[in-house]
Curated annotation (Swiss-Prot):
Residues 111-124 have a biased composition (Basic residues). NCBIfam families: rpsL_bact. Part of the 30S ribosomal subunit. Contacts proteins S8 and S17. May interact with IF1 in the 30S initiation complex. This is Small ribosomal subunit protein uS12.
């Protein structure tokens, strides 16, 4: 334990916070191009076919991103907007694709939580 005079001379070293989404480089979102669109299976105890895409970002990083919602129109060379946010049961997936932005269509027939899935307000 340092003395008061040692602390005055040197101070305490601050521990740098590690980013949860380093490929975004402090940006809220980044644009990218899909290089591969596929499905993968989650960790135990869950079971499903989760839709994911490999995306090359404008800064050169290549990341694995999750495609949220039911159904999607993405294929190779689709231009997408990527945000942070991991998927707990998919190891290595630390980013989400923003639905309803750029080439990604919003989720069809979605009535609740529409803003999260890029769905327009339904007609009366």
């Amino acid at each position: 334990m340092p003395t008061i005079s040692q602390l005055i001379r040197r101070g305490r070293e601050t521990v740098a916070q590690k980013s949860a989404s380093p490929a975004l480089r402090e940006c809220p979102q980044k644009r990218g191009v899909c290089t591969r669109v596929y499905t993968t299976t989650p960790k135990k105890p869950n079971s499903a076919l989760r839709k994911v895409a490999r995306v090359r970002l404008t800064n050169g990083y290549e990341v694995t991103t999750y495609i949220p919602g039911i159904g999607h129109n993405l294929q190779e060379h689709s231009v997408v907007l990527v945000r942070g946010g991991r998927v707990k049961d998919l190891p290595g997936v630390r980013y989400h694709i923003v639905r309803g932005a750029l080439d990604t269509a919003g989720v069809q027939n979605r009535n609740r939580g529409r803003s999260k899935y890029g769905a327009k307000r339904p007609k009366k």
